Amino acid sequence: MSITRYGTVQKGAGGKPLPFARAVEADGWLYVSGQVAMENGEIIDGNIVAQTHKTIQNVLAILEEAGYGVEHVVRCGVWLDDPRDFWTFNSIYQQYFGEHPPARACVQSSMMVDCKVEIDCVAYKAKDK
């Protein structure tokens, strides 16, 4: 079995190096690390709507880089800073995952400063034989 790591040299807020891969692929499984609404090493300004769009776009970019699509996502984990954002988050989430809804857990959690949402996921794609 081979293991491929994506984004092992990355920087977070303030340009500090992050000690984990953005995603790891093994045997057809892709594990995407928690993504936030980060752009150029900083959390974007904005409400739950803007941050949810950016966070999901970051997840989709990693999936695409690894050769996966939204249809391959089997599970998502979601952390919301404010549980009152749940229904707003769901309406945006459905725009991206509506055709291929994965299993999902969603919990409230204190987040890093200015971060309103974090999403990780697991995707699976059968290897060509």
Placement of each model-derived feature along the sequence:
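N-terminal presequence-like segments and the immediate start of the first folded domain
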Residues: 1-57, 61-74, 80-129
